[in-house]
Amino acid sequence: MGDEARQVWEAVQAIYAGFLAGDREAIDRNLSPEATLWDSAHEPLVRGRAELDAMRDRRAGSGPTPTALDAVDPVIDVFGDVALVRHVLLVRFAPESGEPEQRIRNTSVWRLEDGRWLCVHNHEDVLR
């Protein structure tokens, strides 16, 4: 993996670490304020930070919380100041939750802005 691809992958990992820590700011540091998202548990396209925050607020405290997120099998292509990331996310829950592990197929688009890679679009689908 080249240096630029590694930087993008580190930003992807930082988002997942922020999620597990319950740290929105850590996540948001790696998202463009105008990012769009296809979330696996929310059908409409999320457009921008305000819609993302509204979705997060509606979801807060509902359902089991993941205990581990492992992003695997990354495929990253960098085209100048744009990067395309594909990977599978393994989501694990506490055994007592009764929730099975989830496999989520993820594709994201990143843009280099002021020396930092920011996610401008994310698309995830739960694999059954």
Predicted features and spans:
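Short, cysteine-centered beta-strand-loop-beta hairpins and adjacent loop/turn segments enriched
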Residues: 92-100
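A solvent-exposed, acidic/Ser-Thr-rich amphipathic alpha-helical stretch
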Residues: 5-9, 24-78, 101
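A short hydrophobic beta-strand element
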Residues: 78-91
